[in-house]
Amino acid sequence: MRCPFCGAEDTSVVDSRVSEEGSRIRRRRQCTACGKRFTTYETVEVRFPQIIKQGGNRVEFNREKLYTSFARALHKRPVPVGQVDAAIERILQKLLGGGAQEISSRTIGEWVMQELYKLDKVAYIRFASVYRSFEDVGDFQEVIREVQASPSSLDDEPPG
C-alpha cells in the first residue's frame, strides 16, 4: 500500500485487529521509506441486487429507503429499536442470501409487510395503506378485519 505521507510503495503491517462488530479489520502500517505510521481499514464489499420498480426501470438498492419505510410505519409505536433492527437485518439477509442480481420492489414490499405484521399490527396497517394504495375507509376496514380474525403470534404471516 502506498504511504500517504511520502508516496513510497513499500509499507509493512505493524498491527491488525478485528473491530468490535467483527465487520472491519483495522491495520496499523509503517512506511519503510519515511518511517511514518498510518491506519487503514479493510471491509467486505457487499453488492445488493438491482431493484426492479413497478414501471420496469431498475435502480440501485437503497438501504435508507428500507429504514425510512420502517420508521414511518412504526412512528410513535412501542416497538424496541433492537426488534426493528433485527427485522431489517432479516430483509437484508434475504436480499444477499438469495444470490439474485435483480429483485422486484414488490417482493421487498411483501417482506416489509411480513416483518411489520410480526412487530406491530398498527404499523402493518399503516404500511399496507400506502403500499396497497388504499382508496377509501373500506380498504382500511377490510385489512383491520383480516388482522383481527387472524390468531396473534410472533410467527404470524400477514393475511391475504
Curated annotation (Swiss-Prot):
Negatively regulates transcription of bacterial ribonucleotide reductase nrd genes and operons by binding to NrdR-boxes. A zinc finger (unnamed) spans 3-34. It comes from Nitrosomonas eutropha (strain DSM 101675 / C91 / Nm57). GO terms for molecular function: ATP binding; DNA binding; zinc ion binding. This is Transcriptional repressor NrdR. Its cofactor is Zn(2+). Belongs to the NrdR family. InterPro entries: ATP-cone_dom (IPR005144), NrdR-like_N (IPR055173), RNR_NrdR-like (IPR003796). Residues 49-139 form the ATP-cone domain. GO terms for biological process: negative regulation of DNA-templated transcription. Binds 1 zinc ion. PANTHER family: TRANSCRIPTIONAL REPRESSOR NRDR. It comes from the Bacteria. Keywords: ATP-binding, DNA-binding, Metal-binding, Nucleotide-binding, Repressor, Transcription, Transcription regulation, Zinc, Zinc-finger.
